[in-house]
């Protein structure tokens, strides 16, 4: 529909703005009476909350990944201790004072209220005055309703007991928290209605110029996500509903989609053309690119001189940083860990020819290979062979699949101090990774990848899990294999497939491992562990079981409680 071709221009304006803090209110200075003068004013208002939503991903990502078993932020020499905040996430010992817990709550409710303000305004405007058809106007409102449901889904998964706010008119909102079931029902109703009001994707290509808009398949996939986790979130299984809706998406009932041909196509610089993307936040070097400029992509690699290895020295976002590393598969003395959970490098190595296991390299012309960074990282500078050095500058960096104090140790040497925990690590500890490409300065695709929130593979894996839980293991395996085939060479893929198409047995543990491989570092690991009943009971590197299951949800921060006397703290805190 022609009016939504204008969205690209609208996003260009909003994406340049940037979020300044979690407490911003975008309508403080401009009233609705004098703001909405043109059709483009309406479109800009609708998509302003999307820019905040993109920014807010960082808080969710930290809570989901650093409380799980696959990545961690251990102390690296004198770096990344930060008052113990990352250790508390790892050990599940967070408190009501932790800002990380507060940020997700405030970030989501800021976005919710932005959506509410816009929806209130849209309900008072005359669409004909702005030359919108009824269908077009309903689509606009459904954009904000779907985004609001996305925020509420995050809150339901993280805190379970939250207020329900649907308007700037406080009389229409709950005073305190509502029951999880009430919030679940609200999200479900909103999304089911929006699936009918939103446009379906046009054609069989990617989202193209309308990347960043919700469409029918995106809203339906949010429902799949909601139903998949219902048993934990409201105590009632919704796997049947999840499977039915996932199958509809795969059947093309909400638009035409297909898996990317390679594992990394969906993350590449031109992923607006990828048919696997259901919903993504647009990103561009000249506009907003939060996931590059901090905390996600930029901080999964060694610091400082890694830019020479990557060739992205002019990307304009300062030094790379080493916040995230793969949890180790080995002790400092080389003894392999044997825990069921964690050990991500070992889990990838189970299938030795996995393309993602290759050393990450930029190949030029907007191409890359591999996902992992390990061992010595060699590069050439002015015709001379060089290596990435430690950020402290005192030795060549050798990344190993272990955490400890390896300063002065060669690749095969064992340190005198064999302690391995969150407070005993260094810059050589742990493999690093590059999931979204960090292209070199000469590549036009540098920092251009859109952030993919929902992709077709998630729908396939969700359906596979539903079938597995029904006891239809072969059907589940076949579904997973449709995605997994692209991870291995064509002449070797048969030996890596799940039975009955290959020799690998699909068990519940393997299913959880496969979720971890396919969606590694995509901001969902905590939720997956909870669904498999492993988050509190599981054991992984430097992590023993929690004393009970109250840590499956986070507490309300002290500031949040003090701001509203009607709120009650979650049990166990």
What are these regions (language model features)?
Residues 38-56, 79-159, 174-185, 191-206, ...:
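Conserved, well-structured interaction surfaces
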Residues 18-21, 39, 50, 79-81, ...:
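Long, intrinsically disordered, low-complexity segments
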Residues 20-83, 192, 213-405:
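An aromatic- and glycine-enriched ligand-binding surface/loop that stacks and positions planar moieties
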Residues 102, 363, 367-483:
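C-terminal substrate/ligand-recognition segments
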Residues 1-17:
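Sec-dependent bacterial lipoprotein signal peptides
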Residues 154-163, 202, 226-235, 471:
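Short coil/turn linking the two alpha-helices of tandem helical-hairpin repeats
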């Amino acid at each position: 529909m022609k009016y939504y071709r204008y969205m690209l221009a609208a996003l260009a304006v909003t994406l340049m703005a940037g979020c300044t803090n979690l407490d911003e209110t975008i309508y403080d200075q401009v009233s609705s009476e004098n703001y909405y003068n043109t059709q483009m004013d309406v479109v800009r208002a609708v998509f302003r909350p999307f820019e905040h939503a993109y920014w807010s991903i960082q808080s969710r990502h930290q809570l989901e990944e650093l409380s799980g078993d696959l990545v961690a932020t251990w102390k690296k020499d004198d770096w990344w201790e930060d008052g113990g905040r990352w250790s508390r996430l790892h050990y599940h010992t967070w408190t009501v004072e932790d800002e990380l817990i507060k940020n997700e709550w405030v970030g989501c409710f800021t976005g919710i209220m932005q959506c509410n303000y816009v929806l209130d305004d849209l309900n008072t405007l005359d669409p004909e005055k702005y030359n919108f058809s009824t269908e077009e106007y309903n689509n606009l409102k459904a954009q904000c309703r779907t985004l609001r449901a996305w925020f509420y889904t995050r809150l339901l998964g993280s805190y379970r007991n939250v207020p329900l706010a649907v308007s700037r008119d406080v009389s229409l909102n709950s005073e305190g928290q509502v029951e999880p079931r009430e919030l679940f029902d609200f999200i479900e109703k909103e999304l089911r209605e929006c699936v009918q009001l939103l446009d379906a994707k046009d054609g069989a290509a990617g989202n193209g110029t309308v990347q960043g808009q919700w469409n029918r398949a995106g809203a339906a996939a949010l429902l799949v996500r909601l139903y998949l986790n219902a048993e934990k979130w409201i105590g009632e299984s919704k796997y049947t509903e999840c499977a039915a809706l996932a199958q509809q998406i795969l059947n093309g009932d909400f638009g035409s989609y297909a898996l990317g041909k390679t594992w990394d196509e969906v993350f590449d610089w031109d992923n607006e053309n990828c048919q696997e993307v259901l919903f993504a936040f647009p990103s561009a070097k000249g506009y907003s690119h939060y996931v590059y400029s901090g905390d996600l992509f930029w901080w999964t690699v060694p610091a400082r001189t890694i830019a020479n290895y990557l060739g992205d020295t002019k990307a304009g976002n300062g030094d790379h940083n080493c916040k995230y590393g793969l949890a180790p598969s080995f002790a400092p003395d080389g003894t392999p860990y044997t825990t069921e959970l964690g050990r991500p490098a070992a889990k990838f190595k189970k299938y030795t020819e996995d393309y993602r296991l290759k050393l990450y390299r930029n190949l030029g012309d907007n191409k890359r290979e591999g996902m992992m960074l390990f061992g010595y990282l060699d590069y050439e500078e002015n015709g001379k062979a060089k290596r990435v050095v430690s950020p402290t500058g005192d030795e060549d960096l050798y990344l190993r699949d272990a955490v400890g104090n390896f300063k002065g140790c060669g690749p095969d040497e064992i340190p005198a101090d064999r302690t391995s925990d969150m407070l005993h690590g260094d810059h050589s500890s742990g493999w690093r990774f590059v999931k979204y490409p960090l292209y070199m300065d000469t590549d036009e695709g540098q920092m251009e990848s859109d952030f993919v929130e929902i992709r077709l593979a998630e729908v396939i894996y969700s359906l596979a899990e539903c079938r597995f839980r029904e006891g239809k293991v072969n059907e589940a395996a076949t579904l997973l294999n449709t995605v997994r085939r692209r991870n291995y060479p064509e002449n070797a893929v048969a030996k890596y497939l799940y039975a009955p198409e290959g020799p690998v047995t699909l068990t519940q543990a393997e299913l959880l491992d496969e979720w971890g491989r396919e969606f590694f570092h995509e901001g969902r690991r905590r939720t997956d562990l909870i669904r498999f009943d492993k988050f509190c009971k599981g054991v992984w590197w430097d992590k023993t079981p929690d004393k009970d299951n109250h840590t499956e949800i986070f507490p309300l921060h002290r500031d949040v409680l003090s701001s509203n006397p009607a709120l009650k703290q979650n049990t166990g805190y």
